[in-house]
Amino acid sequence: MTHISGLRYAVFDPKTAHWLETAHPGGSQFAPLDMPLSSEPGEAWAYGMSMEWAGHIIERVSGMSLGAYVEKHILAPLGIQDATFQIETRDDLKARLAGLHAHTGEGFTEIPYPEPLMRPQYESGGGGMFASPRAYLAVLSAVLNGGVSPTTGARILKASTVDEMFVPQTLNVPDQGALGSGILPTAMPAFSRPIPLGSGKAWTLSHLTNLEEEKGKSAGSAEWYGLANCYWTIDRQKGVAAIAFSNALPFGRE
């Protein structure tokens, strides 16, 4: 959850990208949970496959699929109906699916969604769910409201759990990686540009946080991103949660 497991996404790490191309040339099918460590656990912060493993652990402990667990404990209590890991089983959501676009240098071209997203081998805790912006905001609103949905009144998290989610967890990690350099590097420029994280950042149990006040953002605010330039933030001091989704690659293109 803190991304110090030693697992890294290939798009941000040359060593993992090299392994992926060598072991699975041309993007052949592979089991993401079989990806090797890029560093020893606890040694360095690196954005990667940790949440995929967290989702897998939830499945093993609960005896439920990740989708069923999320439906029971998050989606249903929040009144969310437009979110799923299995988009091919939801014709109603497929009909509303926003196009995925890539910048070619002369403009944007619509491209197909990757097959592992449309027909997943497993339900990915790191980025396998399709959801509407309204559904995503319903989750953020519950977190902003101390774990209680302001719409349904259902509690999905203890208030103390929400507080713990905002506590920096990486300040004593020996290798701060991108948190220290302020730049999340890229190994696959077609998918992501180098991402400026800025200085004075840490990772919590769930997100990037700024240790000091920034322009328009209170100290201790939450933020993170999706690869297709999808952004979210929570500022608890100001009582604001916000999203901005473009659904376009590469990540970080200005």
What are these regions (language model features)?
Residues 1-216:
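Short, surface-exposed loop or secondary-structure junction motifs
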Residues 226-228:
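Short, small/polar residue-rich loop motifs at catalytic or cofactor-binding pockets
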Residues 57, 233-234:
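Hydrophobic beta-strand positions
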Residues 248-254:
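Generic C-terminus detector
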Residues 198-200, 234-237:
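Extracellular/periplasmic catalytic domains that process cell-envelope and extracellular macromolecules
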Residues 231-233, 239-248:
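Short, well-ordered beta-strand elements
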Residues 218-221:
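A conserved acidic, glycine/proline-rich C-terminal tail/linker
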